[in-house]
Regions:
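N-terminal, charge-rich interaction modules
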Residues: 23-60
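Short acidic low-complexity segments
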Residues: 66-76
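Active-site-adjacent loop/helix micro-motif of nuclease/hydrolase catalytic cores
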Residues: 81-94
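Conserved Class I S-adenosyl-L-methionine
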Residues: 123-139
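Class I S-adenosyl-L-methionine
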Residues: 136-161
Length: 161
């Protein structure tokens, strides 16, 4: 192969990976293009609790809300639980249902791996919804959190707040 051809191929490959890096570095908003922070409804001043969140969670939000993360013993206004297994989900939710008694306005987002992620999980939207309904919560919204994660929003029904 001649040098100009090799140089051209190298230039194309390096441009491709630079472009791929730029795309992957952008905040993920799912299919709608709506910023994740808006999809989740995170409000300024809310106390946030994250459980099992991926390392790049704050980058997905497109706004820095890391200062709103509350200490473990504080009663949060917003919880985002990332669960890989049904067992982990049920263990964490048993604690969160108790917090709903102290803060009936609590917003709980539960995220699980999408089928398209290729990750093994026994947790599904139906499992989450069934647990919520059996424990006095209702689901009011679903969204794509990232390319790998879906999310279901759970709250105490208005009549019980």
């Amino acid at each position: 192969m001649d040098k100009p051809l090799i140089s051209g191929i190298f230039l194309w490959i390096s441009s491709f990976f630079r472009f791929k890096h730029q795309i992957l570095s952008m905040p993920t908003a799912g299919y709608s293009g709506t910023p994740l922070i808006r999809k989740l409804g995170i409000k300024p001043g809310w106390k946030l609790r994250l459980i099992g969140a991926p390392a790049d969670y704050f980058r997905w939000l497109s706004e820095d809300v890391s200062a709103q993360v509350c200490p473990p013993r504080a009663i949060p206004d917003f919880v985002h639980l990332f669960a890989v297994t049904r067992r982990d989900f049920e263990r964490e939710m048993s604690l969160l249902v108790g917090i709903c008694g102290k803060n009936p306005q609590l917003v709980i987002w539960v995220s699980w791996y999408k089928k398209s992620s290729g990750k093994a999980t026994d947790l599904t939207e139906d499992v989450i919804r069934g647990y919520a309904l059996a424990n006095g919560l209702v689901d009011i919204k679903v969204c794509a959190v990232s390319e790998e994660w879906s999310g279901l929003k759970l709250v105490v029904p208005v009549a019980k707040r």
